Amino acid sequence: MRILGIDPGLARVGYGVIDTSGGQQRMLDCGIIRTEPGYSEGDRMVVIASDLRQLIRAWRPELAAVEKFFFYRSSTTISVVQARGVVMMTLARFKVPVVEFPPMQIKLALAGFGHAEKDEVLEAVMRELNLTDPPRPDDAADALAVALTGWFQR
Protein backbone atom coordinates (compact mmCIF):
# COMPACT_ATOMS: atom_id res chain seq x y z
CA MET A 1 0.00 0.00 0.00
CA ARG A 2 1.23 3.48 -0.83
CA ILE A 3 0.48 6.04 1.90
CA LEU A 4 0.85 9.82 1.76
CA GLY A 5 1.41 11.40 5.18
CA ILE A 6 0.70 15.09 5.60
CA ASP A 7 1.70 17.55 8.34
CA PRO A 8 -0.43 20.61 7.48
CA GLY A 9 0.80 24.18 7.78
CA LEU A 10 0.45 27.51 6.03
CA ALA A 11 4.14 28.31 5.48
CA ARG A 12 5.19 24.66 5.11
CA VAL A 13 3.17 21.52 4.50
CA GLY A 14 5.25 18.46 5.29
CA TYR A 15 4.67 15.38 3.17
CA GLY A 16 6.00 11.85 3.24
CA VAL A 17 5.24 8.95 0.93
CA ILE A 18 5.79 5.39 2.11
CA ASP A 19 5.25 2.02 0.49
CA THR A 20 4.30 -0.97 2.63
CA SER A 21 4.30 -3.76 0.06
CA GLY A 22 6.37 -6.83 0.79
CA GLY A 23 5.78 -6.64 4.53
CA GLN A 24 8.18 -3.74 5.08
CA GLN A 25 7.77 -0.01 5.12
CA ARG A 26 10.05 2.09 2.95
CA MET A 27 10.22 5.78 2.23
CA LEU A 28 9.61 6.77 -1.38
CA ASP A 29 9.70 10.55 -0.99
CA CYS A 30 9.46 13.31 1.58
CA GLY A 31 9.72 17.06 1.63
CA ILE A 32 7.72 20.22 2.08
CA ILE A 33 5.34 22.37 0.13
CA ARG A 34 6.58 25.88 0.87
CA THR A 35 4.50 29.03 0.48
CA GLU A 36 5.90 32.54 0.35
CA PRO A 37 5.16 34.77 3.36
CA GLY A 38 4.57 37.76 1.08
CA TYR A 39 1.69 36.04 -0.70
CA SER A 40 -1.92 36.53 0.38
CA GLU A 41 -3.46 33.66 2.34
CA GLY A 42 -5.58 32.82 -0.69
CA ASP A 43 -2.54 32.61 -2.96
CA ARG A 44 -0.76 30.45 -0.40
CA MET A 45 -3.73 28.06 -0.40
CA VAL A 46 -3.57 27.87 -4.21
CA VAL A 47 0.12 26.88 -4.00
CA ILE A 48 -0.66 24.17 -1.44
CA ALA A 49 -3.49 22.74 -3.57
CA SER A 50 -1.45 22.86 -6.78
CA ASP A 51 1.65 21.22 -5.30
CA LEU A 52 -0.41 18.59 -3.51
CA ARG A 53 -2.17 17.73 -6.79
CA GLN A 54 1.25 17.15 -8.37
CA LEU A 55 2.26 14.85 -5.50
CA ILE A 56 -0.96 12.85 -5.77
CA ARG A 57 -0.54 12.46 -9.52
CA ALA A 58 3.10 11.43 -9.15
CA TRP A 59 2.69 8.91 -6.32
CA ARG A 60 -0.93 7.73 -6.63
CA PRO A 61 -1.44 7.10 -2.90
CA GLU A 62 -4.03 4.54 -1.83
CA LEU A 63 -4.42 6.25 1.54
CA ALA A 64 -3.64 9.65 3.02
CA ALA A 65 -2.90 10.13 6.71
CA VAL A 66 -3.29 13.70 7.97
CA GLU A 67 -2.39 15.20 11.33
CA LYS A 68 -5.52 16.43 13.08
CA PHE A 69 -5.79 19.52 15.29
CA PHE A 70 -8.13 20.03 18.21
CA PHE A 71 -7.43 23.53 19.54
CA TYR A 72 -7.94 26.68 17.49
CA ARG A 73 -6.94 29.67 19.56
CA SER A 74 -4.60 31.98 17.67
CA SER A 75 -4.81 33.57 14.26
CA THR A 76 -1.78 31.48 13.22
CA THR A 77 -3.60 28.31 14.19
CA ILE A 78 -6.65 29.40 12.19
CA SER A 79 -4.44 29.79 9.10
CA VAL A 80 -3.05 26.29 9.64
CA VAL A 81 -6.58 24.92 9.92
CA GLN A 82 -7.52 26.68 6.68
CA ALA A 83 -4.48 25.13 4.95
CA ARG A 84 -5.54 21.76 6.35
CA GLY A 85 -8.95 22.31 4.77
CA VAL A 86 -7.30 22.83 1.38
CA VAL A 87 -5.38 19.58 1.90
CA MET A 88 -8.58 17.69 2.77
CA MET A 89 -10.44 19.16 -0.23
CA THR A 90 -7.63 18.26 -2.63
CA LEU A 91 -7.47 14.69 -1.32
CA ALA A 92 -11.26 14.39 -1.68
CA ARG A 93 -11.12 15.63 -5.27
CA PHE A 94 -8.72 12.81 -6.10
CA LYS A 95 -10.82 10.30 -4.14
CA VAL A 96 -7.92 9.45 -1.83
CA PRO A 97 -9.27 7.89 1.39
CA VAL A 98 -8.18 9.85 4.46
CA VAL A 99 -7.45 8.88 8.04
CA GLU A 100 -6.72 11.54 10.64
CA PHE A 101 -4.65 11.35 13.79
CA PRO A 102 -4.03 13.82 16.62
CA PRO A 103 -0.39 14.37 17.62
CA MET A 104 -0.68 12.24 20.78
CA GLN A 105 -1.91 9.24 18.79
CA ILE A 106 1.00 9.60 16.35
CA LYS A 107 3.47 9.72 19.23
CA LEU A 108 1.82 6.72 20.86
CA ALA A 109 1.89 4.69 17.63
CA LEU A 110 5.57 5.39 16.95
CA ALA A 111 7.27 5.89 20.31
CA GLY A 112 4.94 3.93 22.57
CA PHE A 113 3.61 6.85 24.61
CA GLY A 114 1.57 9.93 23.78
CA HIS A 115 3.91 12.49 25.34
CA ALA A 116 7.04 11.37 23.48
CA GLU A 117 9.58 14.00 22.51
CA LYS A 118 10.20 14.91 18.87
CA ASP A 119 13.58 13.15 18.82
CA GLU A 120 12.00 9.92 20.11
CA VAL A 121 9.44 9.99 17.30
CA LEU A 122 12.19 10.77 14.76
CA GLU A 123 14.21 7.81 16.03
CA ALA A 124 11.18 5.54 15.56
CA VAL A 125 10.61 6.88 12.02
CA MET A 126 14.22 6.15 11.12
CA ARG A 127 14.03 2.65 12.60
CA GLU A 128 10.71 1.76 10.93
CA LEU A 129 11.84 3.03 7.52
CA ASN A 130 15.40 1.72 7.89
CA LEU A 131 16.90 5.18 7.32
CA THR A 132 20.51 5.99 8.14
CA ASP A 133 20.00 9.76 8.02
CA PRO A 134 17.09 11.68 9.51
CA PRO A 135 14.58 12.99 6.96
CA ARG A 136 14.71 16.76 6.68
CA PRO A 137 13.20 19.21 7.25
CA ASP A 138 11.31 18.41 10.46
CA ASP A 139 7.94 18.86 8.75
CA ALA A 140 8.81 16.07 6.31
CA ALA A 141 9.88 13.78 9.17
CA ASP A 142 6.60 14.56 10.94
CA ALA A 143 4.67 13.68 7.78
CA LEU A 144 6.46 10.33 7.58
CA ALA A 145 5.42 9.70 11.19
CA VAL A 146 1.82 10.42 10.21
CA ALA A 147 2.08 8.05 7.22
CA LEU A 148 3.49 5.28 9.42
CA THR A 149 0.66 5.81 11.91
CA GLY A 150 -1.77 5.41 9.02
CA TRP A 151 -0.17 2.06 8.24
CA PHE A 152 -0.05 0.85 11.85
CA GLN A 153 -3.65 1.90 12.59
CA ARG A 154 -5.28 0.58 9.40
From Swiss-Prot:
<dbReference type="InterPro" id="IPR002176">
    <property type="entry name" value="X-over_junc_endoDNase_RuvC"/>
</dbReference>
<keyword id="KW-0234">DNA repair</keyword>
<feature type="active site">
    <location>
        <position position="139"/>
    </location>
</feature>
<dbReference type="GO" id="GO:0006310">
    <property type="term" value="P:DNA recombination"/>
</dbReference>
<dbReference type="GO" id="GO:0008821">
    <property type="term" value="F:crossover junction DNA endonuclease activity"/>
</dbReference>
<keyword id="KW-0378">Hydrolase</keyword>
<dbReference type="GO" id="GO:0003677">
    <property type="term" value="F:DNA binding"/>
</dbReference>
<keyword id="KW-0227">DNA damage</keyword>
<feature type="binding site">
    <location>
        <position position="7"/>
    </location>
    <ligand>
        <name>Mg(2+) 1</name>
    </ligand>
</feature>
<dbReference type="GO" id="GO:0000287">
    <property type="term" value="F:magnesium ion binding"/>
</dbReference>
<dbReference type="Pfam" id="PF02075">
    <property type="entry name" value="RuvC"/>
</dbReference>
<keyword id="KW-0238">DNA-binding</keyword>
<comment type="subunit">
    <text>Homodimer which binds Holliday junction (HJ) DNA. The HJ becomes 2-fold symmetrical on binding to RuvC with unstacked arms; it has a different conformation from HJ DNA in complex with RuvA. In the full resolvosome a probable DNA-RuvA(4)-RuvB(12)-RuvC(2) complex forms which resolves the HJ.</text>
</comment>
<dbReference type="InterPro" id="IPR012337">
    <property type="entry name" value="RNaseH-like_sf"/>
</dbReference>
<keyword id="KW-0255">Endonuclease</keyword>
<feature type="active site">
    <location>
        <position position="7"/>
    </location>
</feature>
<feature type="active site">
    <location>
        <position position="67"/>
    </location>
</feature>
<keyword id="KW-0233">DNA recombination</keyword>
<protein>
    <recommendedName>
        <fullName>Crossover junction endodeoxyribonuclease RuvC</fullName>
        <ecNumber>3.1.21.10</ecNumber>
    </recommendedName>
</protein>
<dbReference type="GO" id="GO:0005737">
    <property type="term" value="C:cytoplasm"/>
</dbReference>
<feature type="binding site">
    <location>
        <position position="67"/>
    </location>
    <ligand>
        <name>Mg(2+) 2</name>
    </ligand>
</feature>
<keyword id="KW-0460">Magnesium</keyword>
<keyword id="KW-0540">Nuclease</keyword>
<feature type="binding site">
    <location>
        <position position="139"/>
    </location>
    <ligand>
        <name>Mg(2+) 1</name>
    </ligand>
</feature>
<dbReference type="GO" id="GO:0048476">
    <property type="term" value="C:Holliday junction resolvase complex"/>
</dbReference>
<dbReference type="InterPro" id="IPR036397">
    <property type="entry name" value="RNaseH_sf"/>
</dbReference>
<comment type="similarity">
    <text>Belongs to the RuvC family.</text>
</comment>
<keyword id="KW-0479">Metal-binding</keyword>
<dbReference type="InterPro" id="IPR020563">
    <property type="entry name" value="X-over_junc_endoDNase_Mg_BS"/>
</dbReference>
<dbReference type="GO" id="GO:0006281">
    <property type="term" value="P:DNA repair"/>
</dbReference>
<keyword id="KW-0963">Cytoplasm</keyword>
<comment type="function">
    <text>The RuvA-RuvB-RuvC complex processes Holliday junction (HJ) DNA during genetic recombination and DNA repair. Endonuclease that resolves HJ intermediates. Cleaves cruciform DNA by making single-stranded nicks across the HJ at symmetrical positions within the homologous arms, yielding a 5'-phosphate and a 3'-hydroxyl group; requires a central core of homology in the junction. The consensus cleavage sequence is 5'-(A/T)TT(C/G)-3'. Cleavage occurs on the 3'-side of the TT dinucleotide at the point of strand exchange.</text>
</comment>
